[in-house]
Amino acid sequence: MHDANIRVAIAGAGGRMGRQLIQAALALEGVQLGAALEREGSSLLGSDAGELAGAGKTGVTVQSSLDAIKDDFDVFIDFTRPEGTLNHLAFCRQHGKGMVIGTTGFDEAGKQAIRDAAADIAIVFAANFSVGVNVMLKLLEKAAKVMGDYTDIEIIEAHHRHKVDAPSGTALAMGEAIAHALDKDLKDCAVYSREGHTGERVPGTIGFATVRAGDIVGEHTAMFADIGERLEITHKASSRMTFANGAVRSALWLSGKENGLFDMRDVLDLNNL
């Protein structure tokens, strides 16, 4: 990677998240917007990426071909859909480009493809790039070690009506953080739906509840409930810019790293807390 500004490419440049990623890339010192990508046939192809994001003219035009931009970026930032991200991953692996992946909804094969690619390129892969959410994950680990053995643990998340996967990647990351602190595997203790005559709550499980409504950017709560008291740890996002800023910050952090799989805890050095 270059010693000068890190050049980033933004996938899905015309989407809500893509436009904010462009804004964040233009605002962060040490980062340069190198390329912007949209799907073939998009009416936005040829547009100036900065103008598209409401940030003024940049001279970077929106393209549809990875080959056309391969010399214009060092790190590829992708918040699209799993199938598209995996195609971009293969290209970046082939050409030695770093990646920041904020896409959610991968199946196990997709996650394994990311792990495999990290042998050759540097990747930051996180369910949520918000600083606050990642601090919350650390707090959940601490709370679970103290209270997890005797409380009922529930995770409640809410997002806008357009979100296509449930539970959210962040909710799953919360469950994984709690399960890991309790020396459990989430797949063995998660309860994702309750309907009809369910019987009493099974001790040691982690329940999930999902809300999809309106324009909610993202709200997540973990509840540790006992008889007589409960602890709730909540994060609420009011703007996607918090995710965009974290993603671009992650791209800058990848500077000088040749390979490896990282997450926001690495970027923020939370593992040493």
Curated annotation (Swiss-Prot):
Where, by residue number, does NAD(+) bind? 12-17, 38, 102-104, 126-129
In which residues is (S)-2,3,4,5-tetrahydrodipicolinate bound? 160, 169-170
Xref: PROSITE patterns:
DAPB
> Per UniProt, which keywords does this protein have?
Amino-acid biosynthesis, Cytoplasm, Diaminopimelate biosynthesis, Lysine biosynthesis, NAD, NADP, Oxidoreductase
Q: Where is the active site?
A: 159, 163
CDD domains referenced in this protein's UniProt entry, alphabetically = DHDPR_N
Enzyme Commission designation: 1.17.1.8
List localization entries: Cytoplasm
Q: Can you state which reaction this protein catalyses?
A: (S)-2,3,4,5-tetrahydrodipicolinate + NAD(+) + H2O = (2S,4S)-4-hydroxy-2,3,4,5-tetrahydrodipicolinate + NADH + H(+); (S)-2,3,4,5-tetrahydrodipicolinate + NADP(+) + H2O = (2S,4S)-4-hydroxy-2,3,4,5-tetrahydrodipicolinate + NADPH + H(+)
Q: Name one GO cellular component term.
A: cytosol
Q: Name one GO biological process term.
A: lysine biosynthetic process via diaminopimelate
**Is this entry keyworded Amino-acid biosynthesis?**
yes
| Known pathway | Amino-acid biosynthesis; L-lysine biosynthesis via DAP pathway; (S)-tetrahydrodipicolinate from L-aspartate: step 4/4
Molecular function GO labels:
4-hydroxy-tetrahydrodipicolinate reductase; NAD binding; NADP binding; oxidoreductase activity, acting on CH or CH2 groups, NAD or NADP as acceptor
What residues does NADP(+) bind to?
39
Cross-referenced NCBIfam families, in alphabetical order? dapB
Q: How does it assemble?
A: Homotetramer.
Similarity annotation: Belongs to the DapB family.
User: What's this chain's function?
Assistant: Catalyzes the conversion of 4-hydroxy-tetrahydrodipicolinate (HTPA) to tetrahydrodipicolinate.
Q: What's the protein name?
A: 4-hydroxy-tetrahydrodipicolinate reductase
